[in-house]
Amino acid sequence: MKWISVKDRLPENEVDVIICAQMRYYKGGTIPVVSTAFHTDGKMNTEESGYNWDLGNVDMEYDEEVDAYIVPEGWWESVRYGEEFSAVDDFVTHWMPLPQPPKGE
């Protein structure tokens, strides 16, 4: 698998991928960080989403037509053994699909 630049294309909504982000640190520089995350395009509403967006720290616009909130565009780091996720506040530069799990186990 190869890294894909976010300038070339983005993954589909809510598909878990591996990301590379430039994490800021206290001395003003950045370091590359690799993590799992998913992207949202800012067009999907909470009723279409597979996640529970009942987060007090995410500012969402309400859409009266569909009686749901619009999930903001962005990257969201996900935790695999829980229902938690949080915004990736650093600059994501690249992503790649997750590998397939091992076979025959």
What are these regions (language model features)?
Residues M1-E105:
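Secondary-structure transition motif
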